[in-house]
Design a protein with these regions (language model features):
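A short, conserved alpha-helix within the catalytic core of class I
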Residues: 165-178
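Conserved beta-strand signature within the Rossmann-like core of class I S-adenosyl-L-methionine
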Residues: 178-194
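Short alpha-helix
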Residues: 213-240
């Protein structure tokens, strides 16, 4: 029996990015494959006709490539951390229906998926927790969730498309709190500069009636700007379209590679990695 999704619900907001990951898998099979998204979309009762139509436009196809690269980059950093910390906690901040944690499973890490209660309720239906995996309800800005993470073997945290919706002060407070609680841990996430964040914000800020876009988190020079928050932070960044791959695949046009250069360059679309050093 298929899982029915109604229009204008929390469930609907969760399946749109899920559908994007399915489209990525079809358009760029050599670069990205999300078998869980492909399977889940098949198990869901929902009218995808509008999403299907939109997915074929030029900018939507480039948007799908962005999604694919972001997920690949974050997974690369998680796996890289697990090489030196095989028993680490792998923590997906604002998980939605993303299965990156599971796709990085090395057989000994512990996976935590964190999101709001209504999101986790849907996740428990569609993606119930497996071995060494927990779905945890929380508000990321309320640090009570720190106590639920077993970081005795290290901890790598990742957030995909999450911090654009946070105020700069919220991200700073969260990062400093994590540095206190998880020395030796690592946080990786995607970010962009102010111009890009304004473009991202155009749609959702209108509906939220928020006028001050400038208060929302954006970054151009991550090592300099975020590094200044706290002396314990070891900050680096790489372009998220071309920082991990050259995109020289038959499925990616020269025009899309040009757009990727613009994204990484002018828009500072990047993957930021923060290592939490010891107390100073």
């Amino acid at each position: 029996m298929k899982y029915k999704i109604e229009k204008n619900t929390v469930q609907e907001t969760l399946i749109i990015p899920l559908y994007a990951r399915k489209i990525c898998s079809e358009l760029y099979p050599n670069l990205y494959r999300d078998e869980t998204a492909v399977r889940l979309i098949d198990e869901i009762d929902y009218d995808f006709s509008e999403a299907e139509k939109n997915s074929r436009s030029l900018m939507q196809r480039f948007g799908s490539l962005e999604v694919a690269m972001r997920q690949n980059d974050l997974a690369f950093e998680v796996r890289d951390y697990l090489k030196s910390h095989p028993n680490a906690a792998v923590v997906n901040l604002g998980c939605g229906l993303d299965s990156t944690g599971k796709s990085c499973d090395n057989g000994s890490c512990n996976i935590y998926n964190l999101d709001f209660p209504d999101v986790i309720a849907v996740r428990n239906e569609l993606l119930p927790a497996g071995d060494r995996e927990k779905n945890i309800t929380c508000d990321l800005n309320n640090t009570e969730w720190f106590a639920k993470i077993d970081a005795s073997g290290g901890a790598v945290f990742f957030a995909s498309g999450v911090f654009y919706y946070f105020l700069t002060e919220q991200v700073k407070a969260l990062v400093q709190g994590m540095a206190d609680a998880f020395p030796g841990g690592e946080l990786v996430f995607d970010a962009a500069n102010r111009a890009a964040v304004k473009m991202i914000a155009k749609t959702w800020l209108k509906s939220a009636k928020i006028k001050d876009v400038g208060a929302y988190f954006a970054v151009s020079d991550a090592p300099k700007e975020i590094g200044a928050w706290d002396s314990r932070l070891q900050v680096s960044s790489r372009g998220y379209m071309l920082g991990y791959t050259d995109l020289k695949d038959p499925s990616v046009s020269g025009f899309f590679r040009f757009l990727a250069k613009v994204g990484d360059g002018m828009m500072k679309m990047q993957i930021v990695k923060i290592g939490f050093g010891g107390r100073k």
